[in-house]
Amino acid sequence: NFYVSGRDAGLHVLGLSYRSDKAIGQLCAGSDSCFEPARETILRGQFQGGAPTDLQGIASDEGVYERLYAALRILAASDANGGWAEYLTPGVGAESSIAWSKILISGHSQGGGHAALIGRDHAVARVVMLSSPCDATRNDLPASWLTKSAVYKTDPALNYQALGAPGDTICPSYAAAWLALGMPAGARRADATVCASSAAHGATLACPENASAWGAMLR
């Protein structure tokens, strides 16, 4: 699977759980001004102005940054020789205590959108997006935060990779989002194999026939 491909590429692999009980697409319903603050709320575990009211009760320990920081600290303490400590750096608070430049951020669907936004806000080693990003307006245009005119600390033209499958009806806008980000053709793979055990949207994560694409993006 995708995680095994990461291990085989020589990476430390961490699958993170966080608050994701409602899809960003459902929460924002095509409202361009909603997508970015909704995602920032989930990343930081702190409600941001402009985010949908459904997220008002989010707790800091439900956010991506706090959970990633906590997981890295636990792994560094419990597996002292495992190399996890290299992903931590002295800082104040979770977000500034993560060694972002050493981390490859990846995600599927909603998680891929989070990965893209983390890459905008932090200089990471690489961003890998599977069947994503999906943020699109009611006019089927990529959300404004995805445009290459925005200031990205990780350059999408150099360090963003993506995989999508033909016929993805859950996230039909992923290819337009890749173009908006300014990703080169070689980093945009829209030819994922769909296998018998998965529909198009899940194929980029679940179908082993895509192992060669995973390896290319992760190495």
Annotate the PLM regions:
Residues 104-111, 115:
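Gly/Ala-rich beta-loop-alpha elbow adjacent to hydrolase catalytic centers
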Residues 1-31, 169-172:
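Short, surface-exposed "cap/lid" segments of acyl-processing enzymes
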Residues 72-79, 122, 131, 218:
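Sec/Tat-exported extracytoplasmic proteins
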Residues 117-126:
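Conserved hydrolase catalytic core segment
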Residues 2-4, 116, 149-150:
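Short amphipathic alpha-helical segments and helix-helix/interface helices
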Residues 33-96:
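Alpha/beta-hydrolase active-site loop
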Residues 6-8, 96-99, 120, 152-156:
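Extracellular/periplasmic catalytic domains that process cell-envelope and extracellular macromolecules
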